């Protein structure tokens, strides 16, 4: 019993002294679960987007709602370098290597989220609509493994470039 108490004290002591993982903040571009309105221009994830991308996403969101009643949400937009690095570090921990993690999360130096040139759209029906109809607004799905990742990659009404297999391929 005494040794069990010692172990319990050690475990509780370690738990209390462990530092919590840093959390992202809205000023870093963190977006609440479920996403935010693409019209929330006061949120850094929207405000810091490239203006042409922001306008195209807002126009597409209006059309998706009018045509199909789809409520498009931005689940990720602009991100600070710090937040992007945190996401990459978490992905490395989850997937075991930088090479595997980069298939889903790019480095801050290469991320189009950091440069304000990409948004992730949700929920699934909205991501699907943007993937199929977004080119009307110049918006394109970029990665085959991320239907939600959208960039301004053509002229309105133009043809989207071929999909890249994943973020590491670009």
Where are these regions (language model features)?
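Secretory targeting and sorting signals
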Residues: 1-21
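Cell-envelope/glycan interface and biosynthesis
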Residues: 21-170
């Amino acid at each position: 019993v005494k040794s069990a108490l010692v172990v319990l004290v050690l475990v509780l002591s370690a738990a209390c002294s462990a530092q919590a993982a840093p959390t992202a903040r809205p000023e870093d571009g963190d977006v609440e679960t479920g996403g935010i309105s693409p019209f929330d221009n006061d949120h850094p994830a929207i405000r810091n987007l490239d203006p042409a991308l922001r306008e195209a996403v807002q126009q597409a969101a209006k059309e998706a709602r009018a045509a199909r009643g789809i409520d498009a949400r931005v689940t990720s937009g602009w991100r600070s370098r710090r937040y992007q690095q945190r996401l990459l570090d978490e992905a490395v921990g989850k997937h075991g290597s930088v090479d595997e993690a980069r298939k889903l999360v790019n480095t801050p130096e290469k991320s189009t989220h950091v440069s304000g040139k990409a948004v992730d759209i949700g929920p699934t029906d909205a991501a699907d609509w943007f993937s199929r109809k977004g080119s009307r607004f110049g918006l394109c799905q970029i990665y085959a493994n991320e239907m939600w990742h959208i960039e301004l990659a053509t002229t309105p009404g133009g043809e989207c470039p071929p999909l890249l297999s994943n973020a590491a391929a670009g």
